[in-house]
């Protein structure tokens, strides 16, 4: 039985000043306004033995909001919900850390108390290359978070001078470029800092052990998942002491902090496990396990992942490989995607206009839909300009052109991966919000020339819950 509840949360008091521990050092206090959050959550009921089973919590912190999914050992969903990031923070990078923390606490509060009491393991994902620099003693965030798509061209020449040609870090948006850019500002006591990714930082809030990451998030700072170590060319740099320790995704870090077990009613022996990136979590959710299987995540951005027997890395095209057990998850992420659709259309318009599109007929419109200049994949060009002209009088034709153009970008991505030596894509599963648009799936199937299906599970938070399950099994020796 499925019970859907929608309710309004009472006013949530946000953090009063960025000067608090764990936030930004600032010369002035900036009071943050009160706001209201809305949350959806679903609770699955009607299962025997619920009072005795162990459950596993995964959370996803994407580009626009957070989600949670709670599963049992068989992978059946027991509860799920979502939160948007505080709206007044969306255009203010100084507010991102407090926004993420507020959303984390809200998601935990939204999980039904009876479900929380059964959660034995927690993991979560964050956006790739979203980077924070912290004081290694206090955990205070020392500067604005560097967001996933933020480029640091000032650091690129230095990074290219030390890294192998066409390495993953040789991109202005890489975590390493962000670290070098910050290091070169020569802030006081920089040697006592530590680098964390978004997922690492949120997990640290839960377990309290500063300086732990996973090899998916650490890829873009230069970590080599094949040798399971940082390369010598990186360890020889003065800022290498800021690099976090790296473990496999889904590895137990330690118990949930006592403050969380008391406040939210989680079990005392609940563990916290290393996480992953949002696109990897979406791939895990789809449960694509054979080489040639691919997952396109259609969220605010477009991310493609292809399971390959061969590792492919080429920063010229924004292509990189993540380790997935004994195989490689090859892909990249484009700045096109759902964000530009939301900028141009309301949800109601998208649903209504999509119904009028004939997906079997190609659109003659040739767009490159971006919110602003700059692209990562399949073209790594920080100056690539958006192209949304000419605009036809018909909104249906306009939307058709955008959806088809995004599909063409997706197709160019898979073609590029094949040319670079990855296993050829045979089937594409779809995750993210775009998976709900049946017309778009049919357009993509025609453009790609491949079977395109919805993944059974489309939320990255489900993939994160599978990591929590993995960590719990490893921790118990199963």
From Swiss-Prot:
Family the UniProt entry places it in: Belongs to the FGGY kinase family.
Binding site for ATP: 300, 338, 433-437
Transit peptide: 1-38
Class in the EC hierarchy, top level: transferase
Entry EC number(s): 2.7.1.47
Positions contributing to substrate binding: 60, 64-67, 278
Pfam family membership, one: FGGY_C
Family annotation (InterPro entries): ATPase_NBD, FGGY_C, FGGY_N
UniProt subcellular location: Plastid, Chloroplast
Entry-linked PANTHER family: D-RIBULOSE KINASE (PTHR10196:SF80), SUGAR KINASE (PTHR10196)
UniProt keyword annotations, A-Z: ATP-binding, Chloroplast, Kinase, Nucleotide-binding, Plastid, Transferase, Transit peptide
Protein name: D-ribulose kinase
MF GO annotations: ATP binding; D-ribulokinase activity
Organismal lineage: Eukaryota, Viridiplantae, Streptophyta, Embryophyta, Tracheophyta
Any one of the GO CC terms: chloroplast
């Amino acid at each position: 039985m499925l019970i859907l509840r929608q309710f309004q949360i009472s006013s949530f008091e946000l953090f009063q000043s960025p000067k608090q521990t764990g936030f930004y050092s600032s010369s002035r206090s900036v009071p943050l306004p009160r706001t209201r959050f809305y949350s959806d959550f679903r609770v699955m009921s009607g299962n025997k033995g619920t009072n005795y089973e162990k459950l596993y919590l995964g959370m996803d912190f994407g580009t626009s909001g957070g989600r949670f999914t709670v599963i049992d050992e068989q992978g059946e969903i027991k509860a799920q919900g979502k939160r948007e990031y505080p709206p007044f923070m969306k255009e203010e990078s100084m507010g991102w850390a407090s926004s993420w923390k507020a959303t984390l606490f809200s998601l935990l509060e939204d999980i039904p108390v009876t479900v929380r009491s059964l959660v034995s393991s927690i993991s979560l994902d964050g956006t790739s290359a979203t980077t924070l620099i912290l004081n290694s003693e206090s955990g205070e965030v020392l500067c604005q978070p560097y967001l996933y798509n933020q480029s640091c061209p000032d650091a690129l020449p230095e990074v290219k001078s030390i890294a192998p040609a066409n390495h993953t870090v040789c991109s202005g948006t890489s975590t390493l470029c962000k670290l070098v850019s910050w290091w070169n500002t020569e802030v006081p006591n920089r040697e006592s800092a530590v680098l964390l990714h978004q997922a690492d930082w949120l997990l640290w809030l839960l377990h309290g052990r500063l300086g732990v990451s996973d090899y998916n998030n650490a890829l873009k700072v230069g970590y080599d998942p094949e040798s399971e170590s940082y390369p010598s060319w990186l360890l020889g740099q003065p800022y290498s002491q800021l690099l976090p320790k790296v473990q496999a995704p889904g590895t137990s870090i330690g118990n949930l902090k006592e403050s969380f077990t008391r406040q939210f009613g989680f079990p005392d022996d609940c563990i916290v496990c290393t996480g992953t990136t949002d696109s990897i979590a979406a791939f895990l959710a789809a449960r694509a396990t054979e080489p040639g299987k691919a997952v396109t995540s259609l969220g605010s951005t477009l991310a493609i992942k292809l399971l390959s027997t061969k590792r492919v890395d080429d920063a010229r095209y924004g292509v990189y490989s993540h380790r997935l057990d004994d195989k490689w998850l090859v892909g990249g992420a484009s700045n096109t995607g759902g964000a530009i659709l939301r900028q141009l259309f309301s949800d109601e318009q998208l649903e209504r206009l999509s119904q009028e599109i004939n997906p079997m007929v190609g659109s003659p419109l040739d767009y490159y839909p971006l919110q602003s200049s700059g692209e990562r994949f399949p073209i790594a060009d920080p100056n690539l300009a958006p192209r949304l002209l000419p605009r036809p009088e018909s909104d249906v034709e306009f939307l058709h052109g955008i959806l088809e153009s995004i599909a063409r970008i997706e197709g160019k991505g898979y073609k590029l991966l094949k040319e670079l030596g990855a296993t050829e894509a045979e089937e594409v599963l779809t995750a993210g919000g775009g998976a709900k648009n049946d017309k778009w799936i049919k357009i993509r199937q025609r453009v790609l020339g491949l079977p395109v299906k919805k993944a059974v599970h489309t939320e990255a938070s489900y993939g994160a819950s599978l990591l929590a399950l993995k960590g719990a099994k490893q921790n118990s020796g199963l």
